[in-house]
Amino acid sequence: LPDLEKTTKNFADFGLIWEPRDIVGGDCYWSIKFEKKIWFGLFDCTGHGVPGAFVSLILLSRLMRSFQEAQNDSERLPSKLLNNLDTTLRESLGQNNSSGLRDDGADGSIIQWELGSSKIVFAGANMPILIQKGGKLSEIKGVRRSLGYRRSKSLSEFKDIAIKINKKSRLFIFTDGVTDEGRELDGLAFGRKRLIDFLSKHEKSSLSSLNQLLKDELDDWRKKKPKRDDITFVSMQPL
Protein backbone atom coordinates (compact mmCIF):
# COMPACT_ATOMS: atom_id res chain seq x y z
CA LEU A 1 0.00 0.00 0.00
CA PRO A 2 1.17 3.62 -0.57
CA ASP A 3 3.02 5.52 2.13
CA LEU A 4 0.13 7.15 4.02
CA GLU A 5 2.18 10.16 5.14
CA LYS A 6 3.17 10.98 1.54
CA THR A 7 -0.38 10.43 0.34
CA THR A 8 -1.81 12.78 2.97
CA LYS A 9 0.49 15.61 1.82
CA ASN A 10 -1.23 15.61 -1.58
CA PHE A 11 -4.52 16.76 -0.03
CA ALA A 12 -5.83 19.76 1.90
CA ASP A 13 -7.46 17.23 4.23
CA PHE A 14 -7.50 13.45 4.20
CA GLY A 15 -8.96 10.63 6.26
CA LEU A 16 -8.78 6.84 6.02
CA ILE A 17 -10.43 3.87 7.67
CA TRP A 18 -8.75 0.63 6.56
CA GLU A 19 -9.85 -2.41 8.56
CA PRO A 20 -9.38 -5.90 7.08
CA ARG A 21 -11.84 -8.43 8.46
CA ASP A 22 -8.86 -10.70 9.17
CA ILE A 23 -5.18 -9.79 9.61
CA VAL A 24 -4.90 -9.16 5.86
CA GLY A 25 -7.64 -8.73 3.27
CA GLY A 26 -8.81 -7.83 -0.20
CA ASP A 27 -9.32 -4.06 0.18
CA CYS A 28 -6.42 -2.00 -1.15
CA TYR A 29 -5.72 1.58 -2.19
CA TRP A 30 -3.23 3.19 -4.56
CA SER A 31 -1.98 6.75 -4.99
CA ILE A 32 0.67 8.48 -7.06
CA LYS A 33 1.73 12.02 -7.94
CA PHE A 34 3.11 12.71 -11.42
CA GLU A 35 3.60 16.02 -13.26
CA LYS A 36 1.37 18.10 -10.95
CA LYS A 37 -1.41 15.52 -11.10
CA ILE A 38 -2.66 13.18 -8.40
CA TRP A 39 -4.25 9.76 -8.86
CA PHE A 40 -6.04 7.85 -6.13
CA GLY A 41 -7.62 4.43 -6.49
CA LEU A 42 -9.59 2.17 -4.16
CA PHE A 43 -10.28 -1.51 -4.85
CA ASP A 44 -12.34 -4.25 -3.23
CA CYS A 45 -10.93 -7.61 -4.32
CA THR A 46 -12.63 -10.99 -4.14
CA GLY A 47 -12.50 -12.66 -0.75
CA HIS A 48 -11.00 -11.96 2.65
CA GLY A 49 -7.81 -12.91 4.43
CA VAL A 50 -4.92 -14.41 2.46
CA PRO A 51 -6.92 -15.14 -0.78
CA GLY A 52 -8.16 -11.53 -0.92
CA ALA A 53 -4.69 -10.18 -0.16
CA PHE A 54 -3.25 -12.33 -2.98
CA VAL A 55 -5.62 -10.80 -5.54
CA SER A 56 -4.94 -7.28 -4.21
CA LEU A 57 -1.16 -7.73 -4.58
CA ILE A 58 -1.58 -8.80 -8.20
CA LEU A 59 -3.97 -5.91 -8.86
CA LEU A 60 -1.65 -3.24 -7.43
CA SER A 61 1.31 -4.65 -9.34
CA ARG A 62 -0.56 -4.63 -12.67
CA LEU A 63 -1.98 -1.17 -12.05
CA MET A 64 1.44 0.30 -11.32
CA ARG A 65 2.91 -1.34 -14.40
CA SER A 66 0.09 0.03 -16.56
CA PHE A 67 0.71 3.52 -15.20
CA GLN A 68 4.47 3.33 -15.72
CA GLU A 69 4.08 2.07 -19.29
CA ALA A 70 1.60 4.81 -20.27
CA GLN A 71 3.00 6.96 -23.07
CA ASN A 72 0.84 10.06 -22.69
CA ASP A 73 -1.87 11.76 -20.61
CA SER A 74 -4.75 9.97 -22.34
CA GLU A 75 -3.30 6.58 -21.38
CA ARG A 76 -3.24 7.70 -17.73
CA LEU A 77 -6.92 8.65 -17.60
CA PRO A 78 -8.87 6.70 -14.96
CA SER A 79 -11.00 4.89 -17.54
CA LYS A 80 -7.94 3.76 -19.51
CA LEU A 81 -6.23 2.52 -16.34
CA LEU A 82 -9.36 0.56 -15.37
CA ASN A 83 -9.74 -0.93 -18.86
CA ASN A 84 -6.10 -2.03 -18.85
CA LEU A 85 -6.41 -3.37 -15.33
CA ASP A 86 -9.46 -5.41 -16.27
CA THR A 87 -7.50 -7.09 -19.08
CA THR A 88 -4.22 -7.64 -17.23
CA LEU A 89 -5.90 -8.85 -14.03
CA ARG A 90 -7.89 -11.43 -15.99
CA GLU A 91 -4.72 -12.58 -17.76
CA SER A 92 -2.73 -12.77 -14.50
CA LEU A 93 -5.44 -14.85 -12.83
CA GLY A 94 -5.78 -17.15 -15.85
CA GLN A 95 -9.42 -16.26 -16.44
CA ASN A 96 -9.50 -15.73 -20.19
CA ASN A 97 -11.13 -19.10 -20.79
CA SER A 98 -14.31 -20.64 -19.43
CA SER A 99 -12.76 -23.90 -18.22
CA GLY A 100 -10.89 -22.58 -15.16
CA LEU A 101 -12.07 -23.09 -11.60
CA ARG A 102 -11.27 -19.55 -10.40
CA ASP A 103 -13.28 -16.44 -11.14
CA ASP A 104 -11.79 -13.66 -9.04
CA GLY A 105 -11.68 -9.92 -9.58
CA ALA A 106 -12.43 -6.58 -7.97
CA ASP A 107 -14.67 -3.55 -7.81
CA GLY A 108 -12.90 -0.21 -7.74
CA SER A 109 -12.57 3.42 -8.70
CA ILE A 110 -9.84 5.84 -9.72
CA ILE A 111 -9.85 9.62 -9.29
CA GLN A 112 -7.46 11.99 -11.09
CA TRP A 113 -7.02 15.72 -10.69
CA GLU A 114 -4.47 18.40 -11.43
CA LEU A 115 -3.29 20.43 -8.44
CA GLY A 116 -5.28 23.67 -8.25
CA SER A 117 -7.84 22.52 -10.83
CA SER A 118 -11.59 23.04 -10.38
CA LYS A 119 -12.49 19.56 -11.61
CA ILE A 120 -11.65 15.92 -11.02
CA VAL A 121 -11.92 12.98 -13.40
CA PHE A 122 -13.57 9.85 -12.00
CA ALA A 123 -14.08 6.35 -13.36
CA GLY A 124 -15.72 3.60 -11.35
CA ALA A 125 -15.99 -0.16 -11.70
CA ASN A 126 -19.11 -0.97 -9.71
CA MET A 127 -18.03 1.59 -7.11
CA PRO A 128 -19.53 5.11 -6.71
CA ILE A 129 -18.09 8.36 -5.42
CA LEU A 130 -19.86 10.76 -3.05
CA ILE A 131 -19.27 14.50 -3.54
CA GLN A 132 -20.03 16.98 -0.76
CA LYS A 133 -20.19 20.56 -2.04
CA GLY A 134 -22.11 23.65 -0.95
CA GLY A 135 -24.06 21.79 1.71
CA LYS A 136 -25.24 19.13 -0.74
CA LEU A 137 -24.13 15.52 -1.04
CA SER A 138 -24.44 13.80 -4.40
CA GLU A 139 -23.64 10.29 -5.55
CA ILE A 140 -22.03 9.60 -8.92
CA LYS A 141 -22.06 5.98 -9.99
CA GLY A 142 -19.47 4.23 -12.09
CA VAL A 143 -20.11 1.60 -14.74
CA ARG A 144 -21.98 -1.50 -13.54
CA ARG A 145 -19.07 -3.75 -14.31
CA SER A 146 -16.27 -5.24 -12.22
CA LEU A 147 -12.60 -5.89 -12.99
CA GLY A 148 -11.02 -9.19 -13.99
CA TYR A 149 -13.99 -11.54 -13.76
CA ARG A 150 -14.79 -13.73 -16.75
CA ARG A 151 -18.32 -12.37 -16.90
CA SER A 152 -17.10 -8.76 -17.21
CA LYS A 153 -15.03 -9.41 -20.34
CA SER A 154 -17.87 -8.71 -22.80
CA LEU A 155 -19.37 -5.71 -21.00
CA SER A 156 -19.03 -2.03 -21.97
CA GLU A 157 -15.79 -0.14 -21.35
CA PHE A 158 -15.25 2.17 -18.43
CA LYS A 159 -15.95 5.88 -18.84
CA ASP A 160 -14.42 9.06 -17.47
CA ILE A 161 -16.73 11.50 -15.70
CA ALA A 162 -15.57 15.10 -15.18
CA ILE A 163 -16.84 16.54 -11.88
CA LYS A 164 -16.62 20.22 -10.90
CA ILE A 165 -15.24 20.90 -7.43
CA ASN A 166 -14.10 23.84 -5.33
CA LYS A 167 -11.63 24.21 -2.47
CA LYS A 168 -14.26 23.15 0.07
CA SER A 169 -15.45 20.08 -1.84
CA ARG A 170 -15.04 16.73 -0.12
CA LEU A 171 -14.83 13.38 -1.87
CA PHE A 172 -15.73 10.00 -0.39
CA ILE A 173 -15.08 6.53 -1.77
CA PHE A 174 -15.60 3.29 0.11
CA THR A 175 -15.88 -0.46 -0.22
CA ASP A 176 -19.18 -2.22 0.35
CA GLY A 177 -17.93 -3.53 3.68
CA VAL A 178 -18.97 -0.14 5.09
CA THR A 179 -22.60 -0.25 3.95
CA ASP A 180 -22.98 -4.03 4.41
CA GLU A 181 -21.90 -3.95 8.07
CA GLY A 182 -24.53 -5.86 10.05
CA ARG A 183 -26.28 -4.66 13.21
CA GLU A 184 -25.79 -6.92 16.23
CA LEU A 185 -29.50 -6.97 17.09
CA ASP A 186 -30.87 -8.30 13.80
CA GLY A 187 -28.12 -8.25 11.16
CA LEU A 188 -29.61 -5.21 9.38
CA ALA A 189 -27.04 -3.64 7.04
CA PHE A 190 -25.77 -0.14 7.84
CA GLY A 191 -26.80 0.89 4.33
CA ARG A 192 -26.06 3.66 1.83
CA LYS A 193 -28.79 6.03 3.08
CA ARG A 194 -27.58 5.83 6.68
CA LEU A 195 -24.04 6.60 5.51
CA ILE A 196 -25.19 9.62 3.47
CA ASP A 197 -27.22 10.94 6.41
CA PHE A 198 -24.19 10.52 8.66
CA LEU A 199 -21.91 12.46 6.27
CA SER A 200 -24.46 15.25 5.92
CA LYS A 201 -24.78 15.52 9.69
CA HIS A 202 -21.01 15.89 10.15
CA GLU A 203 -20.18 18.08 7.15
CA LYS A 204 -18.41 20.64 9.37
CA SER A 205 -16.06 18.09 10.95
CA SER A 206 -12.47 17.70 9.76
CA LEU A 207 -11.96 14.56 7.72
CA SER A 208 -9.78 12.92 10.34
CA SER A 209 -12.46 13.61 12.96
CA LEU A 210 -15.19 12.47 10.57
CA ASN A 211 -13.48 9.15 9.98
CA GLN A 212 -13.10 8.52 13.70
CA LEU A 213 -16.78 9.35 14.21
CA LEU A 214 -17.72 6.94 11.42
CA LYS A 215 -15.52 4.23 12.88
CA ASP A 216 -17.23 4.71 16.25
CA GLU A 217 -20.64 4.65 14.54
CA LEU A 218 -19.88 1.36 12.78
CA ASP A 219 -18.45 -0.17 15.95
CA ASP A 220 -21.60 0.82 17.84
CA TRP A 221 -23.79 -0.56 15.04
CA ARG A 222 -21.94 -3.88 15.02
CA LYS A 223 -21.21 -4.06 18.77
CA LYS A 224 -19.87 -7.57 19.46
CA LYS A 225 -20.96 -8.97 16.09
CA PRO A 226 -17.96 -10.04 13.92
CA LYS A 227 -17.18 -7.98 10.81
CA ARG A 228 -18.85 -9.25 7.65
CA ASP A 229 -16.22 -7.92 5.30
CA ASP A 230 -13.09 -5.81 4.95
CA ILE A 231 -13.89 -2.13 5.55
CA THR A 232 -12.28 0.83 3.79
CA PHE A 233 -13.54 4.41 3.76
CA VAL A 234 -11.51 7.23 2.18
CA SER A 235 -12.31 10.93 2.54
CA MET A 236 -10.42 13.57 0.56
CA GLN A 237 -10.35 17.32 0.13
CA PRO A 238 -8.18 18.24 -2.88
CA LEU A 239 -5.58 21.00 -2.65
Regions found by a protein language model. Give the residues of each.
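… and, occasionally, acidic/histidine-rich disordered N-termini of signaling adaptors
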Residues: 1-170, 225-239
